[in-house]
């Protein structure tokens, strides 16, 4: 799907920011930030160290589940595995939404509803992190923007440098064209996630769940269109 990475980047930014502001600084879309927060918590800074520790196995389980789902569809067209992964992640985000509503108002980081919300949300984002690794496709990373921003800056330097060879400039232009929509989408998704939680609470998670359900539906529709064009 043409804009799949852009939509997924917005989903990641939305979910990661919502979980951060709602669940004591928890990052659900990646584990790097949680390692930092666990270290800070071990030294007596911050709170929610049990929550951060509990979501790491959930992230691992999400990656494993993604791999198992992809293996189950290994003998079929790639879009079927993609549709399954998007659908499973959408269901998990609905579970995150339900657990978050149950946990509200969030006051204790080690309460069962809060732990469950963090675990389900991180499980969902573990699936998204593993998705492009278990089903090969052309695209850009959509859950963590550090590498994308770094590459985009390097490409801009190449594009603006007078001595850049034409072949390097062409490659840089093509990469930048792929990178910047995901970067902008992640930033917009992050803003929307924070605002969504402020005004809607955990109900705001319905938005990324619907977006993923749409991607799941479009995976089959796009494949059907291509098949008809080649018929």
Residues of each region from the PLM?
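Alpha-helical transmembrane segments of multi-pass membrane proteins
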Residues: 1-231
């Amino acid at each position: 799907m043409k804009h799949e990475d852009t939509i997924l980047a917005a989903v990641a930014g939305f979910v990661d920011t919502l979980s951060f502001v709602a669940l004591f600084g928890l990052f659900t879309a990646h584990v790097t930030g949680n390692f930092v927060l666990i270290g800070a918590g071990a030294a007596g800074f911050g709170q929610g160290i049990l929550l951060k520790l509990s979501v790491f196995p959930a992230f691992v389980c999400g990656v494993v589940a993604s791999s198992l789902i992809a293996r189950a569809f290994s003998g079929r067209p790639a879009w079927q595995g993609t549709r399954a992964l998007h659908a499973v992640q959408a269901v998990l985000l609905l579970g995150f939404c339900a657990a978050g509503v149950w946990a509200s108002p969030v006051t204790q980081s080690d309460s069962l509803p809060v732990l469950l919300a963090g675990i389900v949300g991180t499980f969902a984002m573990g699936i998204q992190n593993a998705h492009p690794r278990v089903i090969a496709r052309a695209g850009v990373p959509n859950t963590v923007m550090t590498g994308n921003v770094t590459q985009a800056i390097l490409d801009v330097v190449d594009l603006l440098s007078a001595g850049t060879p034409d072949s390097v400039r062409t490659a840089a232009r093509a990469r930048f064209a792929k990178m910047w929509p995901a970067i902008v989408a992640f930033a917009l998704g992050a803003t929307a996630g924070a605002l969504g939680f402020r005004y809607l609470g955990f109900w705001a998670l319905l938005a990324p769940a619907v977006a993923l359900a749409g991607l799941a539906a479009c995976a089959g529709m796009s494949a059907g269109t291509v098949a008809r064009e080649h018929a």
